[in-house]
Amino acid sequence: MTSLLLHAASAALLLAAVSCHDNPPTAPSSGQTPPATYRLVWSDDFDRDGVPDATRWSYDVGGHGWGNNELQFYTAARRENARVEGGHLVIEARREPWEGLSYTSARLITKGKGDWTYGRIEVRAQLPAGRGSWPAIWTLGSTTPLRWPDDGEIDIMEHVGFDHGVVHASVHTRRYNHVDATQRTARTSVPDAAAGFHVYATEWTADRIATSVDGRVYFTFDREPQGGRAAWPFDAPQHLLLNVAVGGDWGGQQGVDDATLPYRFLVDYVRVYQRTP
């Protein structure tokens, strides 16, 4: 998610000390067939109602705009904003007063509980569509403190509610980032993104990042032979983030339609694969 996330590491709230790696994931029960050369290393099928699994997820917390002038306050372990019900993770942005702001939402992270170098990250999700909504599936470097954009960012899926049915994929690095208007990005049409579930995925190797919807690749970013770390910082661990922002520099370009709230971002599963040695 395109943002200056200098506060993200200090805002992370770790709610459990048990590592997700203590519970090896089981084989997928639905969705796309995993690549034959990959093995499943991390997953959440959201099959237990309640707050999200604290062995897999933590939260970024706060309401300082997150570098994008966003309007929401991100809460932690609050079921109104993040819960598992009916086999789905629900991230819900709501209009309500909270810590001096008018909206609440949640931003879930796997940092310290799921950090990977290379692999395939796959999320099956249904998006909100109200004007002012800004859901995202993305990764950030797992260093502490975070150095953005030096540590890299992979945007697997972003959708802004005023541009219904269009999803975006991007990468951000020191050389290529939205602050300098040099980011590498692409967009594709998913007309029923808010009416049905789709598989948003990125395949990340030592030389290429390729992002797809339902198996159709629409964005690639290749390592430059002489680019150095400024162009390719993606040889170090990254972690996953799922969130719904309200408004902001991009999501709020055409305002926020309060009549369309709450915004609900539904996630059927998250799966991470890595190549079999």
Language-model features, listed with the residues they occupy:
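Bacterial N-terminal signal peptides that target proteins for export
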Residues: 1-9
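Extracytoplasmic entry segments of secretory-pathway proteins
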Residues: 9, 22-24
